[in-house]
Amino acid sequence: FSKVIIDEEASTVYLEDPKMKLDVGAVAKGYATERVARTLKEKGVDHILLSVGGNIRAVGRRADGKPWKLDIQNPDLESEQKAVDTLDIDGISLVSSGDYERYYTVEGVRYHHIIDPDTLMPAAYFHAVSIVYKDSGWSDALSTAIFNMPYEEGLNLIENMEGAEALWVLPDGSLKTSSGYEAYRSK
């Protein structure tokens, strides 16, 4: 970050090295999704499900009064089981980060796009992390951050954030959840 120059007064960011790139994709997508949801709600839209590049944000329930039923994609693309879980959501967001959509393979080893800032290599703690939370921007940031943390660290963060819940898909395919996650599981 020493070559990133932020000028708050001028509201600019300058990258000293012309080969550098700054990708705010996930956070920007989550923020934009949340802005659209709030604007629609302010305009009187009571029932809508937004899906913006995998960020899902519900405004209210479905028109029939039932919650929205959403599958969480199985990161094991070879599996016949397409979803690892199904949730009922109402007025909140569901965002997942994982190693299964943006990746490349070199000599049989798959490298994904979520880089661990400590190792500067793709994070290897999980196959996927899904976050249920009231704000899509925060959900996006949390799913990426927690993907880069050991389970206990991520669980501690989620448990201390009121209203946030998480599902972790471990490398062996097993699932772990935060304490309040069960309330969202489809009945």
Task: Please report, for each region that a protein language model flagged, where it lies by residue.
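Mature catalytic core of soluble alpha/beta enzymes
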Residues: F1-K187
